[in-house]
Design a protein with these regions (language model features):
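Surface-exposed beta-strand/loop patches in extracellular or lumenal glycoproteins
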Residues: 471, 476-485
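Well-ordered alpha-helical scaffold segments within catalytic/enzyme domains
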Residues: 19, 84-97, 146-161, 194-206, ...
Length: 643
């Protein structure tokens, strides 16, 4: 069973610091920008049509003649849902009448687009009204429903308004009737509804939604495989090309969920499924699910994860491949996949308080997720490469997906609103509550109101710097549990100036401060931010003979703009010293640049030569990976040869 739960998103109030600044960016720039994009009001940006699709569905429901066509991906509704969820979290912490009016307008539109029986999906209402529930493999009906359920729960939890919750309860009841009462076989080709049903269950207290989630989990991967049978009989395809065989790895349906041990197939689908499995394991005490989650966690994070917290090695199926296949230039590492990995990590933390889950959460958040958005909040990466060479990246047939710069939007725009909803709800990832214990997973400035009868405020510039100061408000005999990152070689913790022995109070990556707290008590932590070299196991062929550099949870990279335009000729000296430069508030939003001693070889004109290249000593300048691509198109590398 669960040993903790996330705090409600409204329990955290942002203060000053690194992540609160990102929350402000999402609130002031990202959410308004994305609303304009969803309304097709942004010039020079890929057309969305997502809200217009819902307007067309509403008109059809009113019996009006609709000559316009549905536009976009079959899952276009989910872009609206994720934007709604991000807006909901923002409204809960920062009331904004204009934004609330926009949100309520979208909710009214969803109500008009919903059919009398609760069915809600603009693609099928507008384009394929006679083919509902006939293509679960491809058509994302349940996926879109899941995202809208999450938005509904978020809006209810953040504002207390239940208008969207009522709409999505009606939709969930429609799905329940279809799959439980009418005994329709099947489950979603793209997992998402499962984790959403667990949220809906907790928001409403209705057991039927948990029951429906369990049904979908239990049905997945059973023989005969549902997708194989559906594919043979349905007679139509979303993407226009019919395949006689079904990639069951891609749809996460090769094996029943309790028998899964290796992460395979589409990376986002995988971690969304694992999130639901871990959630259900915690709610029901299902040891089979819990054991599967442990095996899958190890498969992902010990053998198939990039140093940046990216997952999914290939563009072919946006998928995992095999253990230790982690190419840097042809990588996929979708932003949504790292977000899903954070979802999975949070659920695993609720099963057991182990620092390795939080370490991965940090790795994914501070590198790939933040790197998935331009510093101005208006451009986004779908794919997150670890090596970029303009002229090859985004151009060569094998690297069309690895772009050297972030576009302002995508035809398939799942990632931009996903980043927004994660960052706007980050407080519920930062803190968890157990029995008389408040867990501090992530360090961010602000204050959290605990249901245990006290509040805790935090002052920190983490992860730029390695100090965090917590002040206790109230009087309570309780336990505060602080994450101790594995990368910190020397961590100190003091209470009211008196240092505690971590050997006595720390376990599995958490330091437990158990005492009778008084108003104004101060807990201070200091982490060792000394930058260091990282080496991959020799099982990873792409990184053989190479080194990466990390400071705190942030991986660094070399960009051409800092290194004479060429990082391909650089290598790090084996005994080279890494040096921290002073914090530069004016550079890339405020960073601590690094330099490392190394070498540069001078390129020759010949493609191949007997002559050994000449080399000269250089200082290689490094910046945090999440900041790359913000200064124009240029080369970038995370892993550099070591000589």
């Amino acid at each position: 069973m669960k040993i903790s739960r996330e705090v409600p998103v409204n329990a955290y109030r942002a203060g000053e610091g690194f992540l609160p600044a990102y929350q402000k960016l999402v609130r002031e720039v990202v959410i308004p920008y994305q609303y304009q994009v969803l309304n097709d009001k942004m010039e020079g940006v890929e057309k969305s049509h997502a809200l217009e699709n819902l307007r067309l569905a509403a008109r059809k429901n009113r019996g009006e003649e609709v000559t316009e066509e549905f536009y976009g991906m079959v899952f276009q509704d989910s872009d609206v849902a994720k934007w709604l969820e991000a807006a909901a979290y923002t409204l809960g912490q920062h009331p904004n009448p204009e934004l609330e009016q926009e949100v309520d307008g979208v909710i009214s539109l969803l109500e008009e687009a919903q059919q009398k029986d609760g069915y809600l999906n603009s693609y099928f209402t507008v384009k394929e009204p006679n083919r509902k529930w006939t293509n679960l493999q491809e058509a994302h009906e349940l996926y879109c429903a899941g995202h809208l359920m999450e938005a509904a729960c978020a809006y209810y939890e953040a504002t207390g308004k239940d208008s969207l919750l009522k709409i999505m309860e009606k939709n969930a009841d429609c799905i329940y009737q279809q799959f439980m009462e009418n005994n329709t076989r099947g489950y979603s080709g793209h997992p998402e509804v499962e984790l959403a049903l667990m949220r809906l269950y907790r928001a409403t207290g209705k057991e039927k939604y948990k029951e429906l989630c369990a049904h979908f989990l239990d049905a997945r991967g059973q023989k005969p495989n549902y997708f194989v049978e559906e594919n043979a009989t349905r007679g139509w395809d979303v993407w226009g090309t019919h395949h006689d065989t079904v990639d069951t790895d891609y749809t996460q349906s090769t094996l029943p969920v309790r028998e899964q041990k290796d992460a395979v197939g589409h990376a986002v689908r995988a971690v969304y499924l694992y999130t639901a499995m871990a959630d259900m394991a915690g709610e029901s005490g299902d040891e089979g699910l819990k054991n599967a989650c442990h095996a899958l966690w190890e498969s992902v994070t010990h053998r198939q994860m990039y140093v940046t917290g990216g997952i999914g090695s290939t563009v072919l199926g946006e998928a995992f491949t095999v253990d230790y296949d982690l190419p840097n230039a042809t990588v996929y590492a979708e932003t949504c996949a790292s977000i899903g990995l954070i979802f999975f990590a949070r659920q695993m933390l609720q099963l057991e308080a182990k620092g390795e889950y939080t370490d991965v959460m940090e790795r994914a958040l501070y590198n790939t997720v933040l790197g998935g958005m331009q510093l101005d909040g208006k451009r986004f990466f779908y794919v997150n490469p670890l090596e970029v060479v303009p002229g090859i990246s985004g151009k060569a047939a094998t690297q069309l997906h690895d772009l050297p710069q972030r576009p302002p939007w995508y035809a398939c725009a799942c990632c931009p609103p996903n980043v927004a909803r994660l960052l706007s709800s980050i407080g519920s990832y930062a803190y968890g509550e157990g029995e008389n214990t408040l867990f501090v997973h992530l360090y961010l400035g602000g204050e959290v109101e605990s249901s245990l009868g006290y509040s805790l405020s935090c002052e920190t510039e983490y992860p730029r710097f390695g100090k965090a100061k917590f002040t206790f408000h109230g009087e309570k005999k309780t336990t505060l549990a602080f994450h101790i990152p594995a990368w910190s070689q020397k961590t100190t913790l003091s209470v009211n100036g008196e240092e505690w022995d971590l050997a006595e109070c720390a376990k599995d990556g958490y330091a437990y401060v158990d005492r009778s707290f008084q108003e104004g008590d101060v807990v201070e932590l200091s982490f060792d931010m000394t930058p260091y070299k990282v080496y991959a196991t020799s099982r990873v062929p792409a990184d053989t003979g190479c080194v990466a550099v990390q400071r705190g949870p942030m991986v660094y990279c070399a960009e051409g703009v800092d290194n004479e335009g060429d990082v391909l000729s650089l290598s790090v000296a084996e005994e080279g010293t890494i040096r921290e430069e002073p914090y530069n508030a004016q550079l890339l939003g405020g960073i601590v640049p690094l330099t490392v001693e190394g070498w540069r070889v001078r390129p020759t004109q010949e493609l191949y030569s007997r002559k050994r290249p000449e080399q000269e000593p250089v200082e290689i300048r490094l910046v945090p990976y999440y900041t790359w691509g913000n200064r124009g198109e240029n080369q970038m590398r995370v892993w550099l040869p070591e000589t």
